[in-house]
Every structure is written in structure tokens, then in C-alpha cells.
Amino acid sequence: MYKNPIKANLGEEVNNSLNYKDVSILSNFVNEQGKILPRRLTGLKSKQQKKVTKLIKQARIAALLPFVIGKN
């Protein structure tokens, strides 16, 4: 149905009680370099994208997600 698998099933999870400790879900919104994916790739609505961005930043500060991935 969707070309991008992220668009298919993560929109509902963002609406539910998602918090910064759900690293397995939040890592789906981060690329291989550790950058937050844009809305056009995630398929989220504006309010959902802002929530995910805020939670990813909180998880980074809490050292649950890295700021940069794979940099030598």
C-alpha cells in the first residue's frame, strides 16, 4: 500500500501514549546518521511530527538515543 513502511503503521502509535522512553518506536523516526526524518518521509501530521521531534530530543538528553550515529 505504502512505499515507505514507516508511513503505514506508526501514525497510530504516535497518537497513543508515546513517551521518550519508547526508544524502539522513536528509533524508527531517526535515520542511520541519527537525524530526525522529515514529515514527507514519516507521513505524520504536523502535530504528530512535533511531538515525535520533542520526544526524540528528550531521549537524546536522557542518553537513551545518541546524538550522532556511526561517526568515527
Swiss-Prot record:
UniProt key word Cell membrane: no
Assembly and binders: Part of the 30S ribosomal subunit.
Places the protein is found: Plastid, Chloroplast
Recorded family membership: Belongs to the bacterial ribosomal protein bS18 family.
The protein, known as: Small ribosomal subunit protein bS18c
Entries under InterPro entries matching the protein: Ribosomal_bS18, Ribosomal_bS18_CS, Ribosomal_bS18_sf
Pfam family, one: Ribosomal_S18
One Gene Ontology biological process: translation
Alphabetized UniProt keyword annotations: Chloroplast, Plastid, Ribonucleoprotein, Ribosomal protein, RNA-binding, rRNA-binding
Keyword Chloroplast on entry: yes
Origin superkingdom: Eukaryota
GO CC, any one term: chloroplast
Primary localization: plastid
Organism of provenance: Emiliania huxleyi (Coccolithophore)
Family annotation (SUPFAM superfamilies): Ribosomal protein S18
GO molecular function annotation: small ribosomal subunit rRNA binding; structural constituent of ribosome
